[in-house]
Amino acid sequence: MFQIYHSNKLDLQKDLLVRLISRHPLSDPFQPETILVQSPGMAQWLKLELADTLGIAANIDFPLPASFLWSSFTAVLEDVPARSAFNKEALTWGLMELLPQQLSQTEFAPLQRYLEQDEGQYKLYQLCGKVADIFDQYLVYRPEWIASWESGDDLPDITASQPWQPILWRTLQQHILGLGLSHWHRGNMFNGFVAALNAGKFDHTELPARLFVFGISALPQNFVEALQALGQRIDVHLMVCNPCKYYWGDIVDPKYLARINQRWLSKPGMSVAALAESYHSHGNPLLSSMGKLGRDYLHQIQDLAAPEIELFEDCERTSLLQSVQQDILELDDPSSERVLDAEQKRVLPAEDRSLQLHSAHSPLREVEILYDQLLAMLDEHADLSPRDIIIMMPDVAAYAPYIEAVFGNAPFDRYIPFSISDRTLQQESPLLQSFLRLLGLPESRVTVSEVLEILEVPAVLRQFNLDSDRFERICRWIEACQIRWGIDADQRVRQGLPPFEQNSWRFGLRRMLAGFAMGQSDSLWHGIDPYAEIEGLEAEDLGQLAEFVELLEFCCERLQQEKPVAGWFEVINDILQRAYQPDEQDEILLSQIRQVLEQLQQQLSDSHYQQPLSWAIMRDYLTAELGSSRASQRFMVGAVNFCTLMPMRSIPFRVVCLLGMNDGVYPRAIPPMGFDLMAEHPRRGDRSRRDDDRYLFLEALLSARQTLYISYIGRSVQDNSPKVPSVLVSELMEYCQQNYRLDSDSDNATLQQQLLTEHPLQPFSDRYFTPESSLFSYAEEWLPLLRQQGNTEQSFMTRPLVAEPLEDLELTDLLAFARNPVKHFFQRRLKVFFNSAGVELQDEEPFQLDGLSLYQLKQQLLDASINEQQHQCFERMVASGQLPVGIAAELQTRKLRHDCQEMADKIRPYINAPERIECQLIIAGIPLNGWLTGVYPGALVRYRAANAKGRDMVQLWLEHLVLCASGYRLQSYFFGLNGRHWFDPLEQGRALDYLQEWLNAYRQGLCEPLPLPADTAWILES
């Protein structure tokens, strides 16, 4: 028996399924029920529903359509292998071997041109994968083409643009048969399957006792026919989720009809009457625009002429959402014949929030807004639980970081449990990401950021006996040794670059090892500038870093060689053993990599492909396979579900939320391959990603029981310019405005305002916390900030701190206070230290020196020039990697060295026989102790390779006061690029008086911050 059931609600189909199972149990209690579903998510929902209704759900199989039909083929037909020799993977490897042999034929000229200069057969592998995918589609949707090609008919009317395809298919088929493999494939199996079922010569126990097909929105024509044929031997119940109670297989999207009208009437001799015979009424515009996938499926089912049962349930028009669902159910469009005025439109209650549209500035704001809206729904509806809410988006991986940031960091009192499905193992696992980075090293620049992303993976750190502190230490060494990119000169040559080693990993390691072995050195050692900051037990970390760099070098060298798959298995296993020390969870991930390699071995063995594989092919294969492996789905686990918009997610939820409904993003548009003959000759029922996405949106609209929530990026985060939503959102909004209105709404403005909420850029906008605003937020942590708005004067301290006794004073503390009084207060009294940011690592060698690097370079050159060692200093700078590579270093520093030499010539006469003076003064009973360096027979001298600034002169003034108060009658000089500045000698008593004023200021500065930076003070004094 083959029975079709139509219903607009999945709940009704579930109830029917329960009734059929409970009232008509299988004769053998140990035989499983078989329910065909399209996705694991649907299977999970159905298990929970069956268990809730029946008390238990056990001994039930939930196969997917392709796997079920193949198992049915093996049960009914003879000589059907467990794995088809015509599956996409087998076709790919077969084409890899056969296609190069065909390129000399005229028909293959386009492919021959494409495959020119194909190093390592990488382009061939990519092309064969695409051709195999196209052939696989032909087997399902154009089996008659395949049959004609195999019989020698090239179908020239169809293949005129791609005459190579029938030739290549015949060659491929003959090759597979020549290997002694089965001739069965999905193109010829269906006819054989139907014939075998009619003959009845097979073991009936291999088929399930009965079959339910549940929650599948579309199947290929031959799949449906195979199910009907199967119904001759077992009971097959095909449950169709049909959004409309009337036949709608012939309705047409009005916009599409308008385009057809224009093209039709532009042809000579064409009339409107002739067009009307070909195209029918468009019915409900939402159904006609978004329902092409379901419409084609309905058309296929109607052609079966099988018995049908209808189980439709009307929606109560208590809300806008239910009214729209009822319009679709009744194929109704009140505004189809005329524009409705306000009196003719259906009236909605003013508080209706069943359909919500939210405009945000960014994906993060979308998630933040969603969180507040969900909290409001949960507050308003006490019976609403997180498991009643599903949130879908075009790409869940793009939103996952924002979801975890907002939902994962919510405080306990407003925490909403959540789960994220549909992420791949690669997206969830840093270990797999690091493995793929290791695989990509042969064509990588091996930059510092890439390498450290590999090293900081916990399993890698464990392998090299490192922890987070040691990792940070290594980062500092890398930054100090100017490592930027590249293993060494040889690796750069392999990438077509000049053979230079500066700023490479080998360059930096040599500096570290030389520094550890030799210590501090004033000269180069064999052209190496030793880095002497590594000593003692840190040598172990240096050794681990060297071993890790050896691993990188091993990957770069061994991965670029072509090998048979067994050789690749050996090399990759070697990499895994050398790179990772896995824990229990990591071991599962590493086993996944090995399973993919074993899968590749099996595919090549099945295809009898024995040629060596290049690194590029292996990298692409492993990346694709690991990228398609799903992590734990965690779908329907009692929490808010985040998942990707994908087919058969039309599970009913009370609240359905759609994020990322942006123009150009959804519906997704994937252009067909240029050699896809199905795109040139389309038919009803052909799959299209854009049509699939339109139907997914319609399913989401129909599966929402209480609220449909839609958000999109409606404003630019850069300039606040408006952005339009997805065309599907616009169509829904337009439909609602044409057919519905709120009370007292005469121009649609009120309805639009009710449906669409535009949110501000920031979550702490005062619009969220203003009583008269319709916006709201549960994020009470923003309230203190908002309460301070308008308070122009914010007192950091209500009163000064209690003074601490000052028993003595170091000169260094007094100088630090003069340099930055506020910073000194925070450090001395509040114990707050403004440490500089972490190490900033660069991925490019220096091309142009930045301001800070230029100043540091000038200071080093000035110091060296004063000591008449400028040339040696320049050589060390080159050897340390601070300067650009090659002649650029000479050109960029030529004027700089000249200026430093001139300045040194001016300073040198003042510096002769330097002294270091100990100062011991008593200022107002407080001892002031310290040392003054750079004191010469004629003066105290300071210099800097920059213009003299206020902080320099204040520092010099304080040192000058200490010098004079200590009984020295000397001048104090400061040399800068803007000239020479000095202070004349002071009387000792006067200098002590000035120091007492500084001491008083110092005491005050320990009780409260003094807003008097040295630069500002010098400008005021000047």
Regions found by a protein language model. Name each.
Residues 1-1022:
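Polyanion-engaging groove/track-forming segments
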